[in-house]
Design a protein with these regions (language model features):
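Transmembrane beta-strand segments that form the barrel wall of outer-membrane beta-barrel proteins
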Residues: 164-172, 559-571, 577, 583, ...
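Outer-membrane beta-barrel transmembrane strands
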Residues: 93-94, 196-208, 217-221, 276-322, ...
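Structural signature of outer-membrane beta-barrel domains
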Residues: 36, 70, 108, 171-175, ...
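Gram-negative outer-membrane beta-barrel transporters
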Residues: 690-826
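Cleavable N-terminal targeting peptides that direct proteins into the secretory/outer-membrane pathway or into
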Residues: 1-25
Length: 826
């Protein structure tokens, strides 16, 4: 039985008044993978028309793309925890920052200033203007620059529309709760219909005179949330087929002083508690409000030249809910004079006299007032382009353009807990009065267990205490990009027996990227108790100057060869050279073959270069934790664990603290891509088989915690470089505030993937009409990830792996993916 079963219901309605006219404008031809209009790329390329996209009934662009076997999901509206509020895709599973998104051949800017990630935001694409989508796999850095390692997705817009189009779309998700993994259907609706989404759009196109054309559009989307607890697949966070992953931070306070203490109970402390289902309140689909608007204005000038002005705007609000606020293993000083410590708890927590203080490790899930933490994203993106293209009297074609992009983000993290105020609220005297100088301080009682808000402090946590420790945090960020680009190209005819003609293109480009991130004082002071990622002020600026050349040869026997090179000089002292070579040859009237070989790069993004030192919780395990540690006592001693704490380190979760920062010495990632395609064009059928191989080296990644500990043990010296990266807390853990493993950012990892794509298109006649069958299948042959040069390869094929060594295996890697489409076309 499948884990996920849903039906996407939609209703679309449009009114369209269209004028058809003879095309007189100098129409720009968009060729994906080539800057020369007459030269076709030799890479595997998959194109989807507007009709094919609409048939799927998908509401978002990323939903359609993620359904294709060529693409793995990236960030999307289905992410809440660690969300950036953006949507991205991952071609061949190489990550969103290695999959370049283009609109009419021009790159979109980076998506979010929150994390500085280079992955572009699909929400910026004006989907009401899409004419077709081209997906080119394999590297193409020679044509588009950095980031095109996995390939490119090019959205080609309909810029010649004339008339008025008004559209309305309504949709929802239906799901049947019948999973065998949890007895979920016994206490939930057997069928749910939710996640209602609405879309309203208007497109207006007009030929203003014989020499100009204008298109304007506005597109509004409203998407309702879907909570995980409304689905059997999300009733809890599954741990394989064995049960649920639960949090050790529960409604029962956990207060520990070394080996003393535990979960608060009526008779003192207990050693265990029912775990907290942290996933239930999370959003499976984030609520989202989005407005896209813009225009394209073309003017034909003298001498067959053309001037184009275009502007695109995105205004978006989205909310990522991630469960109740909490304290997680925070070190807090508690006076033994605290009047809410019971007599049974007093000695059990390690108190001897009321004048004593204990340095406790405190965990607590604040469920009393039913608030959940939320990440609120308010994004505004603007992209303006001015382009001038034409042709000289000597038949040289030219195109120059300037693109200016700006994205701003107002990020709010709501309903967190102030760590400093919790410390104040627990630092009280025997009368229950706050000792701190904070005049607003309200005492909090964590020594009495209750699910509900207490009417007075002796019975538990009061509303006044919850109001006092309540905390909202915020970040303001900006990303801007400027592109200056120009190319000239020409076709040359040759009169010889071998070559018919050749094409040459020469170009140059300059890109400037800038990022600003300004967290508020609560972020800067690390006051948010529920934060998994630390945020500091960040400012970074990177620019690149590039020169490139493309050649195309057309032979008299119909063989076509294309080649290109690009040199890139970056402002932080790094440079890169990329190349590609390919051919296309029609063997006969039916069969043809094409192949490509290229080197592509990805240069470190602004965060990877400029990020200040920050700490975050990552999925990892401590081999020295628990009653039966994986390592022996002498090995754990090397990692900083005293012998007296061996077998006494609390193993509470699969999350440890990692500390990292940017590295200005990072080199570009490099990938060698190869492909070969066999194509058969029959009478009513077309078959294409594509073999691909991508080998990536020098992947920018953090050292994993497991690698640091492994190398520390292998060094056999606690003073080695590796062992000094490990900083345990006084209780020996790596999951308590103040503890961490330094995991520097280096060019570490290698990635190797290969596979086969099989594409079929076939028309057949039936009694009810002509039917078109389209099928695309991906067979994954190999997908291996190496954390570093000395590590053994991790097999990703057919797996989804979690942990600090998972790397690019973090995404599911199906062995076979297939999409079948059957349409009645006549």
């Amino acid at each position: 039985m499948p884990l996920l079963r849903y039906i996407f219901l939609n209703f679309s309605f449009s009114l369209m008044h269209v004028y058809v006219y003879a095309q007189e404008m100098n129409e720009e031809i968009i060729v994906t993978g080539s800057l020369i209009e007459e030269v076709q790329t030799s890479n595997p390329i998959f194109s989807s028309s507007l009709e094919e996209i609409n048939k799927r009934g998908t509401f978002r662009v990323e939903d359609y793309l993620n359904s294709l076997p060529l693409i793995n999901p990236g960030n999307s509206a289905l992410h809440s925890n660690f969300s950036s509020g953006t949507s991205s895709i991952s071609i061949r599973g190489l990550g969103g920052d290695r999959s370049l998104i283009l609109v009419d051949g021009k790159r979109l800017p980076s998506g979010s200033p929150l994390d500085g990630n280079a992955a572009q935001d699909l929400n910026q694409v004006p989907d009401v203007l899409i004419n077709r989508i081209d997906i080119l796999t394999g590297g193409k850095s020679t044509i588009y620059g950095s980031d095109a390692i996995g390939g490119v997705v090019n959205f080609v817009l309909d810029k010649n529309f004339i008339g008025t189009k008004i559209s309305m779309h309504q949709g929802a998700y239906q799901h049947s709760n019948n999973s065998y993994l949890r007895n979920f259907n016994s206490n939930a609706d057997s069928s749910v219909l939710d996640g209602i989404n609405s879309k309203y759009s208007v497109v207006v196109g007009s030929k203003l005179n014989n020499n100009s054309h204008f298109i304007g559009y506005i597109d509004y989307k409203n998407i309702d949330s879907v909570r995980w607890d409304k689905r059997d697949i999300g009733a809890c966070a599954f741990r394989g087929n064995s049960g649920c992953r639960l949090s050790s931070a529960t409604y029962m306070s956990r207060i520990q002083n070394g080996s003393n203490g535990g979960y608060v109970s009526e008779n003192g402390f207990s050693s265990s508690s029912a775990g907290f289902n942290f996933g239930a309140a999370n959003f499976l689909q984030r609520p989202d409000k989005r407005m896209n608007s813009g225009f394209i204005y073309d003017v034909n000038l003298a001498n067959k030249s053309k001037l184009t002005f275009s502007f695109y705007n995105l205004a978006q609000e989205s909310n990522a809910q991630i469960g109740a606020p909490l304290l997680f293993r925070q070190k807090i000083n508690i006076p033994c004079a605290n009047p809410y410590i019971t007599s049974a708890q007093f000695s059990n927590i390690g108190c001897v006299n009321t004048t004593d203080n204990i340095n406790a490790v405190v965990s607590k899930r604040f469920v009393e007032n039913s608030l959940n933490r939320s990440q609120f994203f308010q994004t505004s993106s603007n992209r303006g382009i001015i382009q001038y293209n034409g042709k000289t009297k000597s038949d040289w074609q030219y195109k120059i353009y300037h693109q200016n992009s700006h994205t701003s983000l107002k990020y709010k993290y709501l309903n967190d807990i102030s760590l400093s105020k919790v410390k104040n609220a627990l630092n009280i005297d025997s009368n229950g009065s706050c000792i701190s100088n904070d005049l607003d301080c309200v005492a909090i009682n964590l020594f009495t267990t209750s699910n509900n808000v207490a009417n007075n402090v002796t019975n538990g946590i009061t509303q006044e205490a919850l109001d006092y420790i309540h905390l909202n945090l915020s970040i303001y960020g900006e990303i801007s990009e400027k592109i200056f680009s120009g190319v000239i190209d020409r076709e040359f005819k040759l009169e010889n027996k071998l070559i018919d003609n050749y094409f040459i293109l020469i170009g140059g480009e300059r890109r400037e990227n800038k990022l600003i991130k300004l967290p508020d004082s609560s972020f800067l002071n690390e006051d948010g108790a529920g934060q998994q990622v630390q945020h500091q002020n960040m400012y970074g600026k990177v620019s690149v100057n590039e020169a490139f050349l493309q050649l195309g040869l057309a032979f008299k026997n119909n063989l076509k060869i294309d080649s290109s090179v690009r040199f890139s000089d970056y402002s932080f002292g790094k440079d890169a050279f990329t190349y590609d070579l390919g051919f296309y040859y029609p063997i006969n009237n039916i069969f043809s073959i094409k192949a490509s070989h290229q080197k592509s790069i990805r240069v470190a993004d602004i965060q990877e270069l400029f990020e200040p030192e920050e700490t975050e919780l990552v999925y990892a395990t401590d081999p020295c934790a628990g009653a039966t540690p994986e390592l022996n006592a002498s090995q754990c001693l090397l990692t900083g664990l005293p012998n007296n704490l061996y077998q006494n380190v609390d193993d509470t979760s699969a999350q440890l603290y990692s500390k990292s920062s940017g590295n200005f010495n990072l080199s570009p990632e490099k990938a060698i891509s190869n492909s070969i395609s066999l194509i058969a064009d029959l009478n009513r059928s077309r078959i294409e088989i594509d073999f691909y191989q991508i080998n990536m080296e020098d992947q920018i990644s953090q050292l994993s915690i497991a690698t640091v500990i492994k190398n520390c043990v292998a060094s056999e010296s606690s003073n080695s470089y590796w062992c000094k990266l490990i900083n345990r807390s006084n209780d020996g853990t790596l999951s308590t505030s103040g503890s961490y493993v330094s995991t520097p950012l280096f060019n570490l990892s290698n990635f190797d993937t290969s596979g086969l794509d099989f594409r079929l298109s076939h028309e057949i006649d039936t009694p009810i009409g002509q039917v078109l069958i389209k099928n695309i299948t991906n067979f994954l042959i190999k997908k291996d990830f190496k954390q570093d040069a000395d590590s053994d390869p991790i097999n990703c094929k057919g797996f989804y792996r979690l942990g600090d060594e998972a790397g690019l295996c973090y995404q599911p890697s199906p062995k076979i993916q297939n999409v079948l489409d059957i349409s009645l076309i006549k």
